[in-house]
Amino acid sequence: TFNKMWGVITPQEAADKIEEQKKEAGITEPKNLEEQAISLVGTDIYEKLIKGYTEKQWGRPCTELPSFIIKRLPVRLTFDNNYFNALYQGIPVGGYTKMIANMLGDVEVRLNTDYFEHKEELDALAEKVIYTGPIDAYFDYKLGELEYRSVRFEAEVLDQPNFQGNAAVNYTDAETPWTRIIEHKWFEFGKDEEGNDLPKTVISREYSSEWKLGDEPYYPVNDEKNGKLYEEYKKLAEKEENIIFGGR
């Protein structure tokens, strides 16, 4: 990315350019996501690749988001374009649905069952319960509601073999309403279960939106206000003897 944006070749050239733009922005100690991003990759790449996408995803200006959110993204002064650093990366053959179906085996699965409506009965089934729902919902919002972001998917079947040539493409500009498009066939290298080419393709446009009660909460808003409220709920959770809290 640094090479395409600035024409730099060596890691030192890229580092010098980032430092130059960081100084131009007057940043010494980053106070928010915007300043942290500029410190990491410079103003040009922040405005081209980070600002629009991040503000669509979170529904808030980057200046109102905490700096630690952007720190998890890897920055490499190399030509390695992998997102993860793991030596081995992959997805299950046949997809996650097939893998989960195999894992469940003889396990009883209850669909359309509200845990809270049957809590006493369900808790009695095992010594430990793994709860993966929102922590504020577990405590009936007694300390107030945490804020979440929700996601809406718009699927479309296209009468063509290839739409974008890749499983996921992010749209980093502010003008495009969706954050990314998923072309599902490329998770299986464009083949069906028998290894045949697929003449059509399915895409899903992904839209981020503010969560409200009744919506599906996809991820929590990770700012200072919500962080403080979560810590209070965490104290309550630590007093629950037979419940293991998981999830995002």
Give the predicted meaning of each segment.
Residues F2-K128, T132, D136-F139:
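Active-site/ligand-binding neighborhood in enzyme catalytic cores
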Residues K17, G190-K191, I243:
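Short, highly charged low-complexity linear segments
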Residues Y115-E232, L236:
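Mid-domain catalytic core of redox enzymes
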Residues A237-R248:
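Short FAD-binding loop at a beta-strand-to-alpha-helix junction that anchors the flavin cofactor
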